[in-house]
């Protein structure tokens, strides 16, 4: 254990292939970083879709928090960073309806062309400021609608991946603006969704 590891902040950094928990402490005027846990993040093909293994990732995050405590860190806060566009749907009782589907899933193939038969593409880009990519949340949701996915009827709330981890860690459901801006659902000027 280090001399002074009070006021430590943890970063939970989830990437497409791996994740890690990093402890950051200001010691004698210098920022000290230590990777306390590293883990793999693999997608799971089940039926016709590719899913993130959210329960396993959440367990790995909790393992990292426990390891930080065992190393003597006094954790003051945690930041959670993941990829954008993917999400989990929460029902009215606070339960996750399904493992989140991975942006690498083929369900959004061809969706931009279908959406832009309904929306004006240029006006949409002017409103959101987000590059059109088939993986974006807008097209994931439209695919679900086109396929009459019953989760859309049951869902009470959509949480983007970092907010989903935060929700299951704290019990507080929020969507942070920066990650929500990756969805192609937000009005960039009004900073909200219509």
State each model region's role:
Residues 14-16, 124-194:
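Gly/Ser/Thr-rich active-site cleft segment
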Residues 105:
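Carbohydrate-associated surface elements
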Residues 1-99, 110, 114, 126, ...:
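N-terminal glycine/serine-rich phosphate-binding loop of ATP-dependent small-molecule kinases
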């Amino acid at each position: 254990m280090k001399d002074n590891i009070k006021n430590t902040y943890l970063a939970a950094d989830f990437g497409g292939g791996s994740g890690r928990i990093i402890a950051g402490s200001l010691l004698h005027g210098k920022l000290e970083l230590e990777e306390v846990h590293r883990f793999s993040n693999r997608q799971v093909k089940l039926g016709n879709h590719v899913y993130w293994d959210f329960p396993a990732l959440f367990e790995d995050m909790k393992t990292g928090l426990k390891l930080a405590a065992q190393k003597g860190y006094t954790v003051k806060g945690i930041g959670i960073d993941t990829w954008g566009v993917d999400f989990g749907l929460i029902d009215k009782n606070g339960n996750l309806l399904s493992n989140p589907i991975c942006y690498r899933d083929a369900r959004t193939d061809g969706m931009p062309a279908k959406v832009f038969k309904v929306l004006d593409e240029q006006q949409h880009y002017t409103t959101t400021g987000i590059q059109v990519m088939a993986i974006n949340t807008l097209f994931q949701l439209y695919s679900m609608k086109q396929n009459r996915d019953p989760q859309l009827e049951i869902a009470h709330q959509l949480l983007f991946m970092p907010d989903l981890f935060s929700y299951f860690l704290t019990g507080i459901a929020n969507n942070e603006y920066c990650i929500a801006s990756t969805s192609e659902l937000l009005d960039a000027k009004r900073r909200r969704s219509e």
